[in-house]
A protein has these predicted regions:
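N-terminal amphipathic/basic-hydrophobic helices that include classical n-h-c signal peptides
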Residues: 1-15
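Metabolite-binding pocket within alpha/beta catalytic cores that recognizes anionic/polar moieties
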Residues: 15-169
Length: 169
């Protein structure tokens, strides 16, 4: 049994070997949608919605290792002040975020040869930079917002174990 840490909550997940139909690995060894290989993923990941923002953020990086693009998923890995960072676009919507987060977790924690969870869990630091709406009238448009977590009201979490814990946030 593996434990997924999401928003400070420990969610138990039961995974054995992941079937080819459940997680597609491209012929080049990359994750199907985001086209990243496990060794290309840094421990620090910056997510942006708009693919055009990847190059803007990457402008602050040195030692760029690659730039991939597949549909709305654009990625690059480089260094900022000596720290390795991956920048990746998600596109719009919770469906895309779900795809990206699932594939990032697989890149970090699944052995792509055996399709089984790795014995040692790798934790990623993920920072999302982008636009958002606010439900508080006292937050003016254009204000910087720093959140600890977000919860969608679209029903996506109904497909995950631990949804009852998350619904009480």
């Amino acid at each position: 049994m593996n434990i997924l840490i999401f928003g400070g909550l420990n969610i138990k997940i039961h995974i054995m070997r992941i079937a080819e139909s459940e997680f597609i690995i491209n012929d080049d060894g990359s994750a199907f949608h985001i086209h990243l290989k496990p060794e290309e993923l840094a421990d620090i990941v910056i997510l942006v919605g708009d693919p055009g923002r990847v190059d803007m953020v990457a402008g602050f990086l040195t030692d760029i290792e690659f730039r991939h693009q597949s549909r709305e998923f654009v990625s690059t890995t480089g260094k900022y002040n000596g720290k390795r960072i991956t920048v990746l676009s998600t596109g719009i919507g919770t469906d895309n975020i779900d795809i990206v987060m699932t594939e990032l977790d697989a890149l970090a924690n699944v052995d792509f040869t055996t399709r089984e969870p790795k014995k040692e869990h790798r934790t990623l630091t993920i920072l999302r930079i982008g636009t958002c709406g606010a439900v508080q009238a006292d937050i003016p448009l254009g204000s910087p917002i720093f959140s600890h977590y977000s919860v969608g009201c679209d029903g996506l979490m109904n497909w995950y174990e631990g949804r009852d814990e998350l619904s009480n946030l």
